[in-house]
Amino acid sequence: MTTLLNPYFGEFGGMYVPQILMPALRQLEEAFVSAQKDPEFQAQFNDLLKNYAGRPTALTKCQNITAGTNTTLYLKREDLLHGGAHKTNQVLGQALLAKRMGKTEIIAETGAGQHGVASALASALLGLKCRIYMGAKDVERQSPNVFRMRLMGAEVIPVHSGSATLKDACNEALRDWSGSYETAHYMLGTAAGPHPYPTIVREFQRMIGEETKAQILEREGRLPDAVIACVGGGSNAIGMFADFINETNVGLIGVEPGGHGIETGEHGAPLKHGRVGIYFGMKAPMMQTEDGQIEESYSISAGLDFPSVGPQHAYLNSTGRADYVSITDDEALEAFKTLCLHEGIIPALESSHALAHALKMMRENPDKEQLLVVNLSGRGDKDIFTVHDILKARGEI
């Protein structure tokens, strides 16, 4: 099939979907390309970002956790966005695209519930019906977000098949869309899946990096030495990286979830520790068993618990333009506690992975002068029960 935009990033990406979905993907690509050139669409999107979501978000300089080092650390505060995370940015864009295509329903999948909440709020705002597939395990883990979605009129459908987590919710959402794409838009929640989703999601998240660049130049008079973001599917990271890719002096660091430790096999780091395969409509690195079945991913944070990764991250890794590392549950939890105690900010467990790597860079080279920006992709209100239970079990509270 000929496409308007390149469906690949190097060898990664593509459109590995049933033939029945090809017209829906083609229609979506056409709508996106025309919307990008339409000043009216852009004005509407920018108005929602500013006056509904609360952009631009702040760039906060850490006051205390860098004490005794030569590191200057800033946090890009996506946690301050309406809805509580970066997810709100791109769902507003996709919801406007859905309206542009004449769709009346939204289908979405969610892990931590953040994308579900974002999809529900965008649907409520723009008068779209919304149904959200969520792994039954995640429904239990993330009850506050489930209730938020239902408050905003979304139907939440628990998925009991397979591991009852995000990958199963993705499969069910795609199955639904196969039979309903004439009236429904599939609101994919990350920069992964079949073309054109990775490109659409990047473009609807790229204001994160654009704002960061302008803000850091204003505050410090120079670009950062590195920008750091957590990577599950990779939308907050690609949103931060996109505007810095051509700034070759700026390091791009993506942080995958190391779970209980890479050596245990219980992690969510397919980019560095998986094999390339085809899953979820794309060719990308993924966690696979010996015989090629998709393996369970694991992370303390439901939003990073994804067995594959967006194709552009795979490409940036293969070319060496970005570095990808992993952080364990315990390291992320320590970073979570550190930010709460010393800066008065409760970060999402997802974002705590990126923060943990920045703290590691700082501790390993305390005398090194470095200017770092962490994408604080979401707030941790949704995680306080998880953290409470862990700290209680350890006797720390």
Swiss-Prot record:
Entry cofactors: pyridoxal 5'-phosphate
**Keyword field:** Amino-acid biosynthesis, Aromatic amino acid biosynthesis, Lyase, Pyridoxal phosphate, Tryptophan biosynthesis
| Pathway per the UniProt entry | Amino-acid biosynthesis; L-tryptophan biosynthesis; L-tryptophan from chorismate: step 5/5
- UniProt cross-references to InterPro entries, sorted A to Z: Trp_synth_b_CS, Trp_synth_beta, Trp_synth_beta/beta-like, TrpB-like_PALP, TrpB-like_PALP_sf
This entry's Gene Ontology molecular function terms read: identical protein binding; protein homodimerization activity; pyridoxal phosphate binding; tryptophan synthase activity
Signal sequence coordinates: none
Positions carrying N6-(pyridoxal phosphate)lysine: 87
Active-site residues, Swiss-Prot/TrEMBL: 62, 86
| Effect after changing residue 281 to R | In mutant TRPB8
Task: State the similarity comment.
Answer: Belongs to the TrpB family.
NCBIfam families cross-referenced by the UniProt entry: trpB
Q: What is this protein called?
A: Tryptophan synthase beta chain
